[in-house]
Amino acid sequence: MLCGLAALDITPKLGENIPGYFEARRASGVREPLAVRALACSNASGACFALVNLDTIDCDPRLSARARARFERLTGVPGAQMMVSTTHTHTGGPVD
C-alpha cells in the first residue's frame, strides 16, 4: 500500500469574516493555525481513495463537487473515491 499526506494552512487573515454566528465576527488573532489536510492511498492492484478534511464550519456541496472533479481530472481516479469532511469549527474563515 502506498499513502501520501499533505497539509495547507487556511488560517483566516486578521480582520477576515468568521462565519457561523448570528452577529458579524472578524478574526482578531490566531490561537491555533487551521488547515486543510489530505490522505491518499492506493493498493497493489491500483485501487485508490482520498480523504480530505478542512478546518472550516462546513463545505458547500458545489465546492466538494469541484474538488472531486479536479481530483479526477488530475489523477484519473474517480471523484467518488474522494471523501470531503470538515471539523465544523466556528473559528475558521469563509469557504469559497
Description of each model-found segment:
Residues 1-96:
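Conserved beta-alpha junction segments in alpha/beta enzyme cores
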